A protein has these predicted regions:
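C-terminal hydrophobic helical "lid"/dimerization subdomain
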Residues: 3, 280-335
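Glycine-rich beta-strand-centered segment in the early N-terminal region that forms part
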Residues: 30-48, 56-100
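NAD(P)H dinucleotide-binding glycine-rich loop of Rossmann-like/cofactor-binding domains
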Residues: 72-79, 90-155
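Hydrophobic/small residue at the entry helix of a nucleotide-binding pocket
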Residues: 131-134, 159-160, 229
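NAD(P)H cofactor-binding loop motif with strongest signal on the N-terminal glycine-rich segment
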Residues: 155-156, 225
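N-terminal Rossmann NAD(P)H-binding glycine-rich loop of SDR-like oxidoreductase domains
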Residues: 157, 161, 165
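Adenosine-nucleotide cofactor-binding segment
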Residues: 169-232, 280, 284
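Glycine-rich phosphate-binding loop and adjacent beta-alpha segment
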Residues: 228-302, 335
């Protein structure tokens, strides 16, 4: 039996600037299970993530570029519709990296069976998925959390940033949160209870602003944006401060990425530690994260918000809106 799969493909590479909807195409093709790919899955939820932007250029990166005209990839949760594999049954909920399409056929090694949980199943793409794991590993392994310190978080209204803020608050940290809209500022202050939140778009001079809101300086900066914000934060880091580099979204979309940090002397003088990390390197470190995060969620100590677009046809728009900061919390496409 064959079925029609609708999917998102990239029409051309985008070396600089923001993607446009005309850079993408919704295509269809017939698929059917066979001896090699013997499981048919219908996706229910598709994760939309900033790292995908790096795969839309031909530059060498930590993941290969998307292939022009072929299915894009991304994390997804789906349900098994047909199976000739003994380990998977019709109705099983599964996780895969075969998102950006409504249906697909695959082999068993491309799927992970999901356990039922007492919360929305898409939590496996949010706080219980890459989002939460990134925040957890970034803080505990690379940020080297110490009690009673002060953390600055950029892109704090997004999925990773908002999780970082809440973990830090749970551990008694002072949390300074930067975001790009007044609505997100309100959410961070009144629902997530950060110590201070501000809309960076309304700040003329970040260096002066940091001195005003945190004169004692930052012990840790969790960087999701890079660029000028990172450079400004370096000035206000404490001696022996730590900077964890999780993303560089401000530079991925820039038409002129700039010449890099101009205040590296402060890294030397302040004896700062700057550490970049990729969550893909930590797939074998999920057990303590899943245990801790599940408890926080059950106790109401981690809250998550979702921005949801309906239908595979709206996946390109959801991605563009993510890069423009129009999401609060996790960006998802519901199929």
């Amino acid at each position: 039996m064959s079925v029609v799969s609708k999917y998102v493909s990239l029409k051309n590479y985008i070396p600089t600037g923001l993607p446009k909807e005309t850079d993408f195409e919704i295509k269809s093709k017939e698929i059917s299970i066979n001896d090699e790919k013997n499981i048919l899955v219908s996706n229910s939820w598709i994760s939309v993530d900033p790292y995908m932007r790096a795969r839309m250029t031909e530059r060498k990166n930590y993941k290969p570029p998307f292939k022009i005209g072929e299915e894009m990839e991304g994390y997804a949760i789906g349900k098994v519709e047909l199976s000739n594999d003994k380990d998977f049954s019709v109705g099983d909920l599964v996780f895969s990296s075969l998102g950006m399409r409504d249906k697909f056929v695959c082999s068993s090694d491309e799927l992970k069976k999901l356990k039922p949980i007492d919360m929305p199943i898409q939590s496996y793409l949010g706080p219980l998925g890459m989002t939460g794991h990134t925040a957890y590993i970034g803080l505990f392994k690379h940020g080297k959390l110490k009690s009673g310190q002060t953390i600055l978080v950029s892109s704090a209204g997004g999925s990773v940033g908002s999780t970082v803020c809440q973990i830090a608050k749970n551990l008694g940290w002072k949390v300074i949160a930067s975001t790009g809209s007044d609505e997100k500022v309100d959410w961070l202050k009144n629902e997530l209870k950060v110590d201070h939140a501000f809309n960076y778009k309304k700040v003329e001079n970040l260096v002066l602003h940091f001195k005003e809101i945190c004169p004692e300086g930052f012990d840790l900066y969790f960087d999701n944006v890079g660029g000028d914000f990172l450079e400004s934060a370096i000035f206000q880091m404490k001696t022996y401060g730590r900077i964890v580099i999780c993303g560089r979204i401000s530079q991925m979309n820039a038409t002129n990425p700039g010449s890099g940090l101009k205040n590296m002397a402060y890294v030397l003088v302040k004896r700062l530690t700057i550490k970049g990390f990729l969550i893909f390197d930590h797939d074998n470190e999920r057990e303590p994260f899943e245990t801790e995060m599940s408890k926080w969620l059950a106790d109401g100590k981690i809250k998550f918000k979702e921005t949801i677009y309906e239908g595979i046809e709206n996946a390109p728009k959801s991605f563009i809106d993510l890069l423009n900061g129009k999401n609060i919390g996790k960006m998802l496409v519901k199929i």
